[in-house]
Each structure stands twice: as C-alpha cells, then as structure tokens.
C-alpha cells in the first residue's frame, strides 16, 4: 500500500498500544483482577507495540532505498545514520521513561507519549510527500518471501545474530547485574534497577553512535559490496570469540563476583562495538540487495527474520539461564553467533560469482 500508509499505520498502532496500556488499571478492575486476562491484555498490547515499531522502522529504511543513490557510499552513510540515530533515541527513551515514571507516574507517562505521537502523526500527514513507492495491490502473500538468494542468506544470518545478542541480554545480564548490585532489600532493589536501566540505556546510545559512524570507520566510499560482506563475516566471528572468552571466564568461576562484574562490563562494551558495526553492515546490505520495486517486502521479510531471531534469543535466554546460569547463556550465544557466521559464506560466494 506504499510507505506512507505503513508509516502512518505504525504510528497509529503505537498510539493504540500505549492507550491500551494506559487503561490497564481500569480494565483490570472490570475483569475482577483475573490473572489470565490481565496477562493476555498486556501481552497483546506489547505485541501490537512491537508490530508498530517494525512497521515504522521498515517504512523509514525502505524510504532510504528510494531516496539515496547507491554510489560513493551514500546509501551506506544514510542507512547507517538512520539506524544509529534510531538506536540512540531508543537508549535515550529508557532514560526518559525512567524520568517520567519517577515524576508523573505510569499512567500519566503513557498518556504523555500518546499525545506526543498524535502530534507527530498529524504533522507527517500534512508534510509527507505522497507516493514514496508504487502500490502493488496484486501482490500475493507468498511474494512476501524473498526469491533473492542474497536476501535469504542475509536474513538467516540476521536471525542468528540477534538471537545471539538477546540470549544473554534478556535474562542473563539483568539478573547477573541485579545479583551483584543488590542485597535484596527494598532500597537496594530500587537502586539496582535504576543502575541497570541507566547502564543499558547508556550502552544502547553508544551502540547507536557506533552504528552511525560505521561508514566513516570503514571508509565505505571505497569499498565494494563483496568487501563489506567479508568485513561482516570477520566481525561476526570476532563476536563469537568475545562470547567464547566470556563463557570460559564465567564457567571457570575463578574470579570474585565483583571482578567478574567488571569483566562482563568490559566484554559488553567490546561486544557492543563489534555488534554495532555488524548490524550497520547488515542494514546497508539488505537495502543494497533489495529491488526498488519490492523494497518494502524485502525489508519486511528481513525484519521478520530479525523478530524471529529475537524471539528465539528470548526463549533460549530463559531456558539456558534456568539450566546453567550466565555461562549457559553465553555458551548458547556463542553457538548462535557461529551459525550466523556460517550463513555469511554462501552470501559471500554469491556476491563473488556475481
């Protein structure tokens, strides 16, 4: 239906999701506090919020394909800036959310965000140029799945790459940090939650900044697609090495809790730097390989793989932590990274032959 529609739909769904969460207490009262209904209500609202985010992200990145020329590294620079700034804003959002919760409370914070998004949506309706892409109303559902081998291999690599990140980020790292920073008392719990939230937001901001400057770090204007794929392959292998070292250090149990905490923090920053470069390269490659006529479907398929990877990582994060703690999470992340690395080989071979 075109990028304008998907962008508006993304913002609209986000407004609906936030409004639903803001009304949670009233809905909970009307359902007589039924736990199963309450859980389903929150899960559906959060799911709608996730769909909204991906629609908005897909629209923005697809528009870059249409607007930026793929010459002299221009496309790479534009998509890296968009991706990096998006994640920097996401990290800032953690801090803003914490501040809103502290000063005006949960419900008022959500209604404030709803009002802000309504203003943004109305502005976009009036200032957005129409027809960023052609509307292919005859497209079949099966056409969503890409027939481009480059995109299929890249999407597979993306699935395991983000699975490798979330398998230790979702459960392992927050619980490990909490166990080090809190003694279990109410005051220490609050302090620990704030410290962990601040650290993760700071990490995401730096992660986004690294993504934005990746073209400059790699001198992208002078590099071919094949060269960029080779760098991607080396970067994901380096990620696996970082994770393997962290796995060995945590499993050996030779360090004190405090010393291990600092090792993990250093490892997080090293992992984040390389992961940001790799993610930025992926974001460029998906647009470079997409056909202009079906860019929304190609990018949508790619982000479907991204979402599947995050689901896989979240599931494995809980399971692996349950059975083996942080070392098991890190070991699982290492394996997923290696899978991502292996899937880059066919992509490199295809590009070399082409």
Predicted features and spans:
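C-terminal transmembrane helical hairpin of 12-TM major facilitator-type secondary transporters
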Residues: 228-279
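Juxtamembrane intracellular "pre-TM" segments in multi-pass secondary transporters
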Residues: 128-164, 183-188, 219
């Amino acid at each position: 239906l075109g990028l304008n529609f998907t962008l508006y739909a993304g913002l609209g769904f986000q407004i609906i999701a936030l409004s639903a969460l803001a009304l949670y207490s009233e809905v909970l009262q009307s359902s007589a506090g039924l736990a199963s209904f309450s859980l389903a209500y929150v899960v559906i609202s959060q799911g709608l919020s996730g769909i909204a985010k991906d629609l908005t992200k897909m629209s923005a990145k697809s528009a870059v394909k249409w607007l930026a020329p793929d010459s002299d590294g221009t496309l790479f620079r534009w998509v890296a800036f968009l991706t990096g700034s998006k994640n920097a804003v996401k990290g800032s959002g953690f801090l803003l959310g914490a501040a809103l919760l502290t000063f005006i409370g949960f419900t008022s914070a959500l209604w404030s965000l709803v009002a802000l998004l309504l203003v943004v949506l109305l502005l976009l309706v009036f200032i957005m140029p129409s027809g960023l892409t052609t509307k292919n109303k005859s497209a079949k559902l099966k056409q969503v799945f890409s027939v481009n081998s480059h995109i299929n291999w890249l999407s597979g690599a993306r699935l395991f790459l983000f699975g490798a990140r979330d398998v230790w980020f979702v459960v392992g790292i927050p619980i490990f940090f909490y166990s080090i920073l809190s003694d279990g008392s109410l005051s220490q719990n609050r302090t620990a939650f704030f410290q962990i939230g601040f650290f993760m937001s700071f990490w995401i901001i730096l992660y986004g900044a690294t993504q934005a400057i990746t073209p400059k770090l790699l001198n992208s204007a002078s590099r071919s697609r094949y060269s960029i794929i080779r760098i991607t392959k080396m970067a994901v292998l380096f990620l696996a090495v970082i994770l393997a070292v962290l796995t060995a250090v945590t499993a050996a149990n030779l360090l004190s809790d405090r010393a291990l905490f600092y090792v993990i923090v250093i490892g997080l920053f090293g992992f984040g730097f390389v992961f940001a470069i790799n993610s930025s390269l992926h974001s460029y490659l998906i647009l470079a390989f997409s056909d202009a006529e079906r860019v929304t479907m190609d990018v949508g398929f790619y982000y479907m793989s991204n979402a599947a990877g995050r689901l896989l990582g979240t599931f494995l994060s809980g399971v692996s932590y349950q059975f083996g703690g942080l070392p098991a999470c890190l070991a699982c992340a290492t394996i997923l990274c290696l899978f991502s690395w292996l899937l880059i080989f066919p992509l490199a071979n295809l590009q070399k032959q082409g």
